[in-house]
Amino acid sequence: MILVLANSRDLPARRLVETWRAHDARLLTLADLSRAGWRHYVGEVGPEIAIACGELIPAASINGVITRIPWVTPEDLLHVVDGDRHYVAAEISAFLLAWLSQLTCPVINRPTTNGLMGAPHAAEGWMAIAARAGLRLPWTRRVFPAPPEPAWPPEAITVAVLGDRCFGNVDPALADQACRLAAAANVELLAVTFSHAAAGATFLGAQLWPDVSLPELAAALLARFVPAAGRAAANVAEAAA
């Protein structure tokens, strides 16, 4: 079984779960986290139980988890009484941090104390990490309040990184830079945007929400969780070579 921890409105997550239906993939939403029946122990005390799609799931049967929420906010908990939402959001966030950290199966991305998807960074934080990783940076000017969307050029291109693999039609030098950035940020799954696809492009930004429903990336993610899928992917790559 594979769990995708995501908001119920996350369309790429829903598409991924549908693609992986044959592998018993389930969407784990915040509504599931409000249901009775969860069991989590600090240390090896008893059997862990999760709930997804309203069903009790032994933690031992979980082959992997993809996390698509950085933290739980009161706005995520409209099914909770208004006056309790801030408290419940903090409690669920703390519970998820403990639960995800203790799972022995692959968890992408692994949580940190700053975020359930790995360390979140503002635009300036990603620029600093990119500089340390040797990426080429643009001159930037910040205005306040910030615009709702970055003003990127139309030729800008976004690639996805999973471990040491880059998915996207860019120059190999940019693919290598994207992988270096993910390693420097200590995350396994990352979306990286460059000013264009050719060598010499500048780094524009990064975020932890790549479109996981893209076929090539979805296949690589599945190979991380299901050994048979990993062997099949390796055979395809070997045949193509």
Can you annotate each of these PLM segments?
Residues 7-19, 30-137:
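Conserved N-proximal alpha/beta basic substrate-recognition cap immediately N-terminal to
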Residues 25, 137-141:
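Short, well-structured beta-strand/strand-turn elements
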Residues 117, 147-148, 172, 209-214:
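A short local loop/turn or secondary-structure capping micro-motif enriched for an aromatic residue
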